[in-house]
UniProtKB/Swiss-Prot annotation:
This is Small ribosomal subunit protein uS4. Disulfide bonds: none annotated. One of its GO terms (cellular component) is small ribosomal subunit. Signal peptide: none annotated. HAMAP family: Ribosomal_uS4_B (MF_01306_B). The gene is rpsD. GO terms for molecular function: rRNA binding; structural constituent of ribosome. Residues 22-42 are annotated as: Disordered. Part of the 30S ribosomal subunit. Contacts protein S5. The interaction surface between S4 and S5 is involved in control of translational fidelity. Residues 92-152 form the S4 RNA-binding domain.
Amino acid sequence: MARYTGPAWKLSRRLGISLSGTGKELEKRPYAPGPHGPNQRKKLSEYGLQLQEKQKLRHMYGMTERQFRRTFDQAGKMPGKHGENFMILLEARLDNLVYRMGLARTRRAARQLVNHGHIMVDGARVDIPSYRVKPGQTISVREKSNNLVVVKEAIEVNNFVPEYLTFDADKLEATYTRHAERAELPAEINEALIVEFYSR
């Protein structure tokens, strides 16, 4: 399944979650798009709830189904809870951490920064958004890209960097000090439903 490239606001309303992280998509119309307005939602089956939860998380991180399932399978080989490990692996993606650093206002914009070669890991350019960052590695903006308008604008409005990143705003770099804990990850996601979905 290909990555969704349509209007993020429409997908956010359909899934009932802000994919941009701003919450603006749901302010005026917190219901799915369509001609029937706020009264169109039907009660979902158990399978429907599981599928919806999977789609929420997959689209939140901007992944294809193949990438998503591969990461899920990798998480299942780790010690500990499958669902929590899955969330931790998703959070360690390079494009996501660029977003968490505040260098981009959305994950989609962060993915573009990585794709276009503006991001470095431990001093080497990495242009693979799915690159999994390891604790202790440093993420930075290429010196030639320090004055990008999109980066400057994103930093101006960002007021939160998670505790598993130590961010130096002057150098535009952060160290991924440790893996995220479940309490630091999206509370609106019930990963147990996703484990159930793939275990059917």
